[in-house]
């Protein structure tokens, strides 16, 4: 038995809400994945504030209709699709999907959309290779700390150098 019009409208509204909060969308071919494997993917995505929705392409098409931010997603809506919608750690979600695909060897990323731009598989892989937000913040903090240390050493070196020069001059004057 098919879905009623009301349930389809409810699904479209839920998709619109998820898309409104999402920063990135990935489109995966889920053909051949078991329910257990899909549950595993959903669990992996939770840590990165990602959700995986399996829905008909026509319902997703209705959800993105008239939304310029997501309209480019239309070109990926063919075949059996699962949609990964990410509203937080984009890199973490891509890494979770890549780890899942490596473990199962069944799913394939068709493409994605980030900030209105269609992403190829290579661009998605590049996002997954980026360090996490926390790692980047640690690198920046380390760089700032190194600069502050060098400035402090430089400021401290001026009077020390002057003192050494005066001492050397005084010693050479005695001889």
From Swiss-Prot:
Pfam families documented for this protein: Ribosomal_L10
Gene3D superfamilies: 3.30.70.1730, 6.10.250.290
This protein's record includes keyword Metal-binding: no
GO cellular component: a single term: ribosome
The keyword Hydrolase belongs to this UniProt entry's keyword annotation: no
Matches recorded under InterPro entries: Ribosomal_uL10 (IPR001790), Ribosomal_uL10-like_sf (IPR043141), Ribosomal_uL10_bac (IPR022973), Ribosomal_uL10_bac_type (IPR047865)
GO MF annotations, alphabetized: large ribosomal subunit rRNA binding
Membrane-spanning segments: none
Swiss-Prot/TrEMBL keywords: Ribonucleoprotein, Ribosomal protein, RNA-binding, rRNA-binding
Known partners and oligomeric status: Part of the ribosomal stalk of the 50S ribosomal subunit. The N-terminus interacts with L11 and the large rRNA to form the base of the stalk. The C-terminus forms an elongated spine to which L12 dimers bind in a sequential fashion forming a multimeric L10(L12)X complex.
Family: Belongs to the universal ribosomal protein uL10 family.
HAMAP family, alphabetized: Ribosomal_uL10 (MF_00362)
Task performed by this protein: Forms part of the ribosomal stalk, playing a central role in the interaction of the ribosome with GTP-bound translation factors.
Record-given protein name: Large ribosomal subunit protein uL10
